[in-house]
Each structure stands twice: as C-alpha cells, then as structure tokens.
Amino acid sequence: MSSKEQNVHEEQVSKEKEGMESVMNESQEQVKSEDAQAEFDAQAELVQALARVDELEKQLQQSQKTEREAMIRAQAEIENIRRRTQQDVEKAHKFALEKFSNELLPVLDNLERALSAADHENEQMQPMIEGLELTLKSFLDAVRKFGIEVVEEKNVAFNPEVHQAMTLIDSPEHEANHVVDVMQKGYTLNGRLLRPAMVVVSK
C-alpha cells in the first residue's frame, strides 16, 4: 500500500472512530437525560402521593371529628329525653296526687262538720262521736303519709301564701295582722298549697 493510500485509510479510520465516539457520547447524554427525566417523574409522583396521603389524613380527621360531634349530640339528646321523661313522670305523679288530694278535702270537711254538729252532751251519741273522731284521725294520719299537712294555726302572723283573709276585726289580745280564728282549715301537699285556710285577721 502506498503512502498516500495509507494516509487516506488512516483518515477514514480516524473519522469512523470520531463518529463512533460521537454516537457513544450522544447515547450517554441520552441515557443521562432519560435518567434525569425518570428521577424527576419519580419525585413528582412521590410529591403527588404525599399530597394525597395528607389529604386523606385530613379527611379522616374531619370524619372522626364529625363522628365525635354526632356522638356527643346523640348522648346529649338521650340525656335530655331521659330528663324530660323523668320530669314528665314526676309532674304526672304530682298532678295525680294533687287531684286526688283535692277530692279528699271535702270528705275531711264533712267529717269535721259532723263532729262539730254532734251533741257532745248526749251520752247516747258518744259512741258515734268517738267513731267519727277515730275515723277523722285515721284519715288525717293516712293523708299525712303522702305529704298532706293541715293549716290551722291560730295566733300566727298572716301569711298570704297559705291564708285567705275573710274578715278583719279589732282584737286587743292579738298583734296586728295575726290570725284570730280559722273558719276553714287549709291544706298543703309536699309544701305546695292545696287550699288556703280561711281566717279571721286582727287589725
């Protein structure tokens, strides 16, 4: 091979070598670019995944908070219903007892009137009078067990909560505005007025 041909051959080999190096460099750059893109994509997916996890955690917290609030409201409503039911039962019981007690008052009045009208001087009437007295005493003992009390005190200060003034009189023996006499007894039920005592009051 001549010197000229050898030079041409060497130049051709050199060009081919440079071409191969260029291709290899381009391949390496392409691989690096693809790796960088893959890493970027992976980071983006990770950020999205973390954001989704954060969103789900917030939703879970909100759901738990809503459930707790609903449970608290339900418990409060149950307690309110229980309290209202208990109050209604107590009111119904008190109303029924009060109504029943009011029905008994005329019976007590009639027994007392019968005793007042009876001839206590007549010996033949004594057994009947004693029977009336025992009946009245038993009756009063029975109603006291349910909280009924008699308002019949004299010489006490007039109390508009339990007394009803029927008349005013001058009475040197009593202080002003005091009960002189009881015309009709009053009654209370567990501290609540059933019927005021009708009284005569001193001026």
Curated annotation (Swiss-Prot):
Organism this protein belongs to: Proteus mirabilis (strain HI4320)
Biased composition (Basic and acidic residues): 1-20
Pfam families named among the record's database cross-references: GrpE
Gene name tied to this protein: grpE
GO molecular function annotation: adenyl-nucleotide exchange factor activity; protein homodimerization activity; protein-folding chaperone binding; unfolded protein binding
Domain of life of the source: Bacteria
Keywords: Chaperone, Cytoplasm, Stress response
Stated role: Participates actively in the response to hyperosmotic and heat shock by preventing the aggregation of stress-denatured proteins, in association with DnaK and GrpE. It is the nucleotide exchange factor for DnaK and may function as a thermosensor. Unfolded proteins bind initially to DnaJ; upon interaction with the DnaJ-bound protein, DnaK hydrolyzes its bound ATP, resulting in the formation of a stable complex. GrpE releases ADP from DnaK; ATP binding to DnaK triggers the release of the substrate protein, thus completing the reaction cycle.
UniProt record similarity statement: Belongs to the GrpE family.
Xref: InterPro entries: GrpE, GrpE_coiled_coil, GrpE_head
Subunit structure, as described in the record: Homodimer.
Subcellular location: Cytoplasm
Region (Disordered): 1-38
Protein name as catalogued: Protein GrpE
HAMAP family: GrpE
GO cellular component, one term: cytosol
GO BP terms: protein folding
